[in-house]
Amino acid sequence: LSEITDYDSKLIEELFIKYAKVNTRSDANSHTVPTTVGQVKLAKMVEKDLHDLGIADAKYEPENSYVIGSLPSNSDKDLSAIGFIAHLDTADYNAENIQPQVHPNYDGGEIVLNAEKQMVLSPKEFPLLKHYVGQRVITTDGTTLLGADDKAGVAAIFGALKYFLTHPDVEHGDVKVAFGPDEEIGRGAKRFPAKEFGTEFAYTLDNGQPGQIEAETFNASEAKIDIRGTAVHPGDAYGLMVNAVTLANEIMSALPKDEVPEKSRDHQGFILVTDMTATVGEAHLNLIIREFDTQKYRRNLALLHQIVDRINDQYDSPRVSLKINEQYQNIGDTVKQHPYIVNLALNVYHQLGITPSITPFRGGTDGNAITAKGIPTPNLFNGGDNFHGPYEYVSTEAMTKTAQVVSEIVQEHVREYGHRDESPVKLN
């Protein structure tokens, strides 16, 4: 096994800070690809840095905004290619003038983020900080997010690539890497060039602590309900008025009372009314449906149709219309058919002394769209925490550990050649 000191932590930290300073906040209201110019700027930086590192075929593809590169196999074995993927955009939070702050040899106490705003990063509020004692912790200055989601993943992939390039005697198969746009708004991977990428499977490095592997996600849909009322003067309304507000309330009352985000965790799903506008004459509801269990997910979609049909049956003509847009499918249904992908990562965790944690991801990742395109893609980790806000942080050591895991997965793929661990994986 490689040693953690075999990895260039200085390069990893420098690249992370350089990339973090680029504003790559994605914009759900934009219709360009990518949605913001900062993502193009960073993609071209990543392309150049890959070339400088020694990845000769690295290229930025304007048609999909992905940067793709590969490390050719040096093995005489007929090894399938493995992919590693990270995203370049950041969440919908201030990303202008990001100034990463490095705190060497973190002592376990409070970290002052911004004295003027009296903002501190405290282990009392964020207990996972205690795991970073003695490490080089990188934080915000309290005015922006940091962008460890997912620039920590980007930097870690660079660290793994450099390991192989500086250790040419280490046997490996083809390694493909991809860095893409607009993950935070669920668009980027829809354009992922799966045929060109051509790996048997891949991993995203999107959030989470060392040892984490997320091999299942929600099934997800969004629903739009439009209600047509009949508005008349209240004094003359008998037998005439149809109050769209009342119908909207009837719909919401028919939804499962306990299947809401504030009452669900682990493998429990939910139906959430995200917003509503309502007058007597018309009402509009937007909902999201999230569920791990595919059969229950289908039942919940059917339930919405039943509720709408039941109301419409009370009137001479339909008053309520329902449109459902299916957003992504649970990758677990596919990953269960390919247990080697999860076992490969778990075996590496055990070898490195990392405690594994198979957790359901209560959301979606780029892996959903990529899996749907034929490349099973669970999520690992990037070592950061408190994503999407001013308390976000990561450590140089955690990113370096991520690089080591990436490298060892590639090497374990060689070691298991001809005798893969295909034992069933229990996800739930």
What are these regions (language model features)?
Residues 78-174:
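Active-site metal-coordination/substrate-binding segment of hydrolases
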Residues 111, 135-148, 181-305, 309, ...:
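Midchain, well-structured core segments that form catalytic/ion-binding scaffolds
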